[in-house]
């Protein structure tokens, strides 16, 4: 087949006429160095602090150092195949994660991608991981309780909705167990939960997820995971991602609870990134802004007022306040709470629960030290019946600790001192509680009432646990209406007091424990 010159020229004219030119402006740069997950990029202009930079292979890096001639970025993922000379692109976007109800019951990574093998997640959109905390005018005071299900916590260190309560202690003192029990206790309360696991073993996280599933608490919980094998950047960003997912519920007039397990490992990951970016180290080799790292995160946990929720939802939700309660966890070394990160977080939060190794090893679990554990705002939110009854518990324990120290040096004690010691021992025993066995407000009130009104006097110390178990079983079977009333109202009046006295007198007369 031969083409003549006219056909060739017509074909060329046709191609020229249909040729479409599209121009695309791209902010492109070149990798000039790669080391330990940190890349240095030349040629990128107009880059924001915290901007996502697109790398080859559908990966991203986070711009953290903006210098005159280069950009220092931390790779969010594997970096072994990155090399000098590769082209990268600025996206013009800050890091965002998916939010919405579709995340409940799922296990996701720092970027909100599912890692539980249950398929794609239906989200309600994306939100930036770094959001400025609500202002002073947008907040409301904390006056509603959040029940952890632990007698020792709800009676002595009460937590309110929108509070930040630090759980601090050495390794293996029950910090995670306390936080997981608090999540399990919310399964029927309507409070949505977020559990952020930072720098933990994958097997430990799998066990936590399994326990949440066993106790039917996973359905209202989002689990955000950055394991010990994940990049330092992902461990550093995980708490912010989880906080954004929790804020979705707060801003729509609902209540949410978030657990950061733990912020010590996040600080270590941030220190690693900062040192690799050649930022000047300070105390304990942490960078100068490690306080701001945690303060900007924990300030986002708050209770917001009605006008904030109405403005955010554009009038769709009316007359509701929202809250995000934070339970950050800090691991101490040999009980040293005066280290850099623990003191920072103690000063940021609204109280702390100290878990002591010697109490844990002596069999007191949860190992809460009532002497130095405080809640700075939770008292206003405490359920009335528990608040009224628990005042004497803290005093009894404080006096017991003081007298027990003196009793070691003296065998000759008067009757009043001996009675105080016996009462303190029994109250300490009563505060013990098994894991995965949270108690309702009514059950806690009944247990505290029995101690406060002297019903433990004739019960041997070794039988306190059996006494409590039998008392709860008896109350549930014979006085369920009374327990329901206390759980619904939380009030304490003469009628409730008389009913509790009657219940305990009848029960103690049976001696059935």
From Swiss-Prot:
Keywords: ATP synthesis, ATP-binding, Cell inner membrane, Cell membrane, CF(1), Hydrogen ion transport, Ion transport, Membrane, Nucleotide-binding, Translocase, Transport. It is an enzyme of class 7 (translocase). The record marks 373 as: Required for activity. It catalyses: ATP + H2O + 4 H(+)(in) = ADP + phosphate + 5 H(+)(out). It is found in: Cell inner membrane. Produces ATP from ADP in the presence of a proton gradient across the membrane. The alpha chain is a regulatory subunit. This is ATP synthase subunit alpha 2. It comes from Photobacterium profundum (strain SS9). The gene is atpA2.
């Amino acid at each position: 087949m031969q083409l003549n010159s006219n056909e060739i020229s017509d074909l060329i004219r046709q191609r020229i006429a249909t040729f479409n030119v599209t121009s695309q402006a791209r902010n492109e740069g070149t990798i000039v160095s790669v080391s330990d997950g940190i890349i240095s990029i030349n040629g990128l202009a107009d880059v924001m602090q915290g901007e996502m930079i697109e790398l080859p292979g559908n990966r991203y890096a986070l711009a953290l150092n903006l210098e005159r001639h280069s950009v220092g970025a931390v790779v969010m993922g594997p970096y072994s195949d990155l090399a000098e000379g590769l082209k990268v692109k600025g996206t013009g976007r800050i890091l965002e994660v998916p939010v919405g109800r579709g995340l409940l019951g799922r296990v996701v990574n720092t970027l909100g991608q599912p890692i539980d093998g249950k398929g794609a997640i239906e989200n309600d959109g994306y939100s930036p991981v770094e959001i400025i905390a609500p202002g002073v005018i947008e907040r409301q005071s904390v006056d509603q309780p959040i029940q952890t299900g632990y007698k020792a916590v709800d009676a002595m260190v009460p937590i309110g909705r929108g509070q930040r309560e630090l759980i601090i202690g050495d390794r293996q003192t029950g910090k995670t167990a306390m936080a997981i029990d608090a999540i399990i206790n919310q399964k029927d309360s309507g409070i949505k939960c977020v559990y952020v696991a930072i720098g933990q073993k994958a097997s430990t996280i799998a066990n936590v997820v399994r326990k949440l599933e066993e106790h039917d608490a996973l359905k209202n919980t989002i689990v955000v995971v950055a394991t010990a094998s994940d990049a330092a950047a992902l461990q550093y960003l995980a708490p912010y991602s989880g906080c954004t997912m929790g804020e979705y519920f707060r801003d729509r007039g609902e209540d949410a609870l978030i657990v950061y397990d733990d912020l010590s490992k996040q600080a270590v990951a941030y220190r690693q990134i900062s040192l690799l970016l050649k930022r000047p180290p300070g105390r304990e080799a942490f960078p100068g802004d490690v306080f701001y790292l945690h303060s900007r995160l924990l300030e986002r946990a708050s209770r917001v007022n009605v006008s904030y929720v109405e403005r955010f939802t554009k009038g769709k939700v009316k007359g509701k306040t929202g809250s995000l309660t934070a339970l950050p966890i800090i691991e101490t070394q040999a009980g040293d709470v005066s280290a850099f990160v623990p003191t920072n977080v103690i000063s940021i939060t609204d109280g702390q629960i100290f878990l002591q190794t010697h109490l844990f090893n002596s069999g007191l679990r949860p190992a809460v030290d009532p002497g130095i554990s405080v809640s700075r705002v939770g008292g206003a939110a405490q359920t009335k019946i528990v608040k009224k009854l628990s005042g004497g518990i803290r005093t009894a324990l404080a006096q017991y600790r003081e007298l027990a120290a003196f009793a070691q040096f003296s065998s000759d004690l008067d009757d009043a001192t001996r009675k105080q010691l016996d009462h303190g021992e029994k109250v300490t025993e009563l505060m013990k509680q098994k894991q995965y066995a949270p108690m309702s407000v009514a059950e806690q009130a009944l247990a505290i009432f029995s101690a406060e009104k002297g019903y433990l006097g004739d019960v041997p110390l070794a039988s306190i646990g059996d006494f409590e178990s039998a008392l709860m079983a008896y109350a549930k079977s014979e006085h369920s209406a009374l327990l329901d009333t206390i759980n619904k109202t939380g009030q304490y009046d003469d009628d409730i007091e008389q009913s509790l006295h009657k219940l305990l007198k009848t029960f103690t007369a049976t001696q059935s424990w």
